[in-house]
Amino acid sequence: VFLRVYGGPHVQYVQRRWDERWGLFDQVMAQRGYVVYSLDNRGSDRRGVAFESPIHRNMGGPEVEDQMVGVRWLKEQPWVDPQRIGVFGWSY
């Protein structure tokens, strides 16, 4: 599994549409047997001030906690080798 992270602020990764920026990468990785996993943590866009504001002057806390919830969920899945979870992404 590749965990793609973007800690914020702004941007919404998870959408119900083809993503021109990452769609081809995700498709190639899937064809090679990998899963690319993304979640929108607190601080990401389009969910209102209450969802976006927790990282204001508090970066490195709430968004990391949210990503770790995702990692724990991934480790419980039968199709995931918990010893082979990588992370990539960018932000502040």
Predicted segments with their positions:
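Serine-hydrolase catalytic core recognition
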Residues: V1-Y92
